[in-house]
Amino acid sequence: MSKELSPKYNPAEVEAGRYQKWLDEDVFKPSGDKKAKPYSIVIPPPNVTGKLHLGHAWDTTLQDIIIRQKRMQGFDTLWLPGMDHAGIATQAKVEARLAESGISRYDLGREKFLDKVWEWKDEYAATIKEQWGKMGLSVDYSRERFTLDEGLSKAVRKVFVELYKKGWIYRGEFIINWDPKARTALSDIEVIHKDVEGAFYHMNYMLEDGSRALEVATTRPETMFGDTAVAVNPNDDRYKDLIGKNVILPILNKPIPIVGDEHADPEFGTGVVKITPAHDPNDFLVGQRHNLPQVNVMNDDGTMNELAGEFNGMDRFEARKAVVKKLEEIGALVEIEKMTHSVGHSERTGVPVEPRLSTQWFVKMDQLAKNAIANQDTDDKVDFYPPRFNDTFLQWMENVHDWVISRQLWWGHQIPAWYNAEGEIYVGEEAPEGDGWKQDEDVLDTWFSSALWPFSTMGWPDVDSEDFKRYFPTSTLVTGYDIIFFWVSRMIFQSLEFTGRQPFKNVLIHGLIRDEQGRKMSKSLGNGIDPMDVIEKYGADALRWFLSNGSAPGQDVRFSYEKMDASWNFINKIWNISRYILMNNEGLTLDVARENVAKVAAGQAGNVTDRWILHNLNETIGKVTENFDKFEFGVAGHILYNFIWDEFADWYVELTKEVLYSDNEDEKVITRSVLLYTLDQILRLLHPIMPFVTEEIFGQISEGSIVTAEYPVVCPEFENEEAAAGVEALKDVIRSVRNSRAEVNVAPSKPITILIKTSDSKLDAFFNDNINYIKRFTNPEHLEIAADVEVPDLVMSSIITGAEIYLPLADLLNVEEELARLEKELAKWQKELDMVGKKLSNERFVANAKPEVVQKERDKQKDYQAKYDAIVVRIDEMKKLVK
């Protein structure tokens, strides 16, 4: 048992050193019990690009809740941690750091640059693990993995080679998304589309014979130097006679052909389109159909090359302005049509991507996608929570394109392909024998290795490894909806292809963390929250409680310090209840408490309130477990909160004072036993969510760690509907009296007369048997319970099931004085309403003030109106009493 609980809850003291103690005790490792059912989770590996944000804290908290509960339920649990090398993201960070010293990666060379990246990785991996510790994550560090570990790299090479042998990985020259800042290819889902201000630039391409001009329009006039044709629809009567003739490309003054192609839409624009096969995916296809040259006019950094003539060396956007100016000078510019359009931007660097002809490696997706879709109709399907994300997954799979997997980076898995001077390609898990071979310098997309994470971390391709046989497929994946396409989908099709199984049985999808106003957290808005700052102020348990109760699966959650205050207050309440129970414990052990609780359940000891709280505890255990199984942690948290704060603390703990302050020692022992037992069960129910404080309090009542303690289960012998109904009726009486006191402004300390007129003989007997509880909570001067109670004229009345409750008012208050007080109160709120109404009726204020300021005034108005209306009701009631 640990030291006595401090008088005040201090999360810093409670959490200090606790995580290291858990690690020293090896409580996070799998039990190794072969009779136990395995339950495994692989952590979505965070990028080693920096510190973890609040979204990571949410994601990992949900996983820890799941794994801690399953561990307590006796499962053989494995939560495998690890990190992702995050190719483009990490390389960009390291390049930015080097740039501060005026150094580029090219100055260092590949080997020395990679040394710098490994230093970065070690630095931030240590930071991430420190953050995991502060969050209390119960991961098994003995199995920690990194996506560039040799074992995982072996898996990557094997998958690449096997897919290549099947013809599902190929190399070719196609239009891809190019990031000019990172100088690498990007896959479609690494491109974010943003609406930006732009223009259609209309220009004339003169026929070679000078007879007429054809008007074309483009949003990227700087690519015109790569035009190798213009296209018209072969069924367009306006132009079909021109097919086969030439137009003159302005500025360069070279002839290019007019081709007939269905790509040209007669209904759109002039019906004539310029064809730039090396800079547009649709034009690329037109070029293939008509055997057009592919002219790339840009360098990999987004500057124009020598094929752009006088614009050689200019940045693409500077070239755009210069080209438009030149077109205007030579009379080829028709008009500039301003508009807003969607432009793809690099997810990592934020710059507009450039569609560009490039030789890359691709994964052929058609059969892999078909396999993944078909699997969702089998018993081995992946279950999504909420289920609607299954449709999201299937929709993406049905419309997926081939995946460009090569990246022009240095940090990552180098592609296992080698070339020789004869133009031969060798693809293998190891380098080819002999001289003259040079390995492809590109690396694989980060998501290629991440897609293998659930099984590569378990030892695959060694299918006989203990972890692979025991813990794969994994049980549950927890992740955000923003990476279903990037990661979840790819893990599913790769796992099905290489293991024949789904990678996980369940996928729990959560949303995004937003600020109080519902905005996404970002550096540009300056509204990001560091979870470590929150932990320093409130403790990890309070943050975890907020994150687990913030929303339902698939929904976003709004962070607010007001909610954090509420979380801390709840834990403080638990702390204070625990101290009260322990201070009144008198050396009672948990084993003895369990024996006494069994007697209460059997009806051999205790009173109705003891049986009631055990009944409600039992219901709480059932509902919490049921909602945990559905990953409805918010619902489970709400149930726990209501039981702990409302039923246990506010009612049962207060009701026990009737016994604990009496002289009946036998009853005291029973009451202490129920208190201690219920506290023990509460701590176990709460532990997956708030591990630190529950461990601290658990140490006061039991040996060993709560981490490996048994999770509560429903006990049929605790069911007692009769006791539950009886105590609920007692509570109704007490609440009614309290509410009536408040309505007529009578202090709780003032003794009053209470008359309870019953219409149910059983209830009458029950109230009289438990009259002391009513007295303790209502402070009566006179209390009468009977079917024929005599009721005076001037009373406050309320009705509950089976009884009517009356408070005679003649001696309690002066109705005229109370009416005067209420009228004065009403005038006060009318004044407040007038002031806020005046402000909100000011159009300039509403138009110019910040939205949150206006909303605050509207909230005030709503609050003041509610107070005003409540007083009006009170005045009406008082006037009725006078009559």
From Swiss-Prot:
Reported function: Catalyzes the attachment of valine to tRNA(Val). As ValRS can inadvertently accommodate and process structurally similar amino acids such as threonine, to avoid such errors, it has a 'posttransfer' editing activity that hydrolyzes mischarged Thr-tRNA(Val) in a tRNA-dependent manner.
> What family does the Swiss-Prot or TrEMBL record give for this protein?
Belongs to the class-I aminoacyl-tRNA synthetase family. ValS type 1 subfamily.
Which BP terms from GO are recorded?
A: valyl-tRNA aminoacylation
What are the protein's UniProt keywords? Aminoacyl-tRNA synthetase, ATP-binding, Coiled coil, Cytoplasm, Ligase, Nucleotide-binding, Protein biosynthesis
Where is coiled-coil annotated? 809-844
Which molecular-function annotations from GO does this UniProt entry contain?
aminoacyl-tRNA deacylase activity; ATP binding; valine-tRNA ligase activity
Motif 'KMSKS' region in this chain: where? 520-524
Quick one: which residues bind ATP?
A: 523
Subunit description: Monomer.
- EC assignment: the record states 6.1.1.9
Q: Which HAMAP family match?
A: Val_tRNA_synth_type1
Q: Where is the motif ('HIGH' region)?
A: 46-56
Instruction: Name a single GO cellular component.
Output: cytosol
What reaction does this catalyse? tRNA(Val) + L-valine + ATP = L-valyl-tRNA(Val) + AMP + diphosphate
Domain comment text?
ValRS has two distinct active sites: one for aminoacylation and one for editing. The misactivated threonine is translocated from the active site to the editing site. The C-terminal coiled-coil domain is crucial for aminoacylation activity.
Keyword check for Phosphoprotein: no
- Cellular localization per UniProt: Cytoplasm
Q: What is this protein called?
A: Valine--tRNA ligase
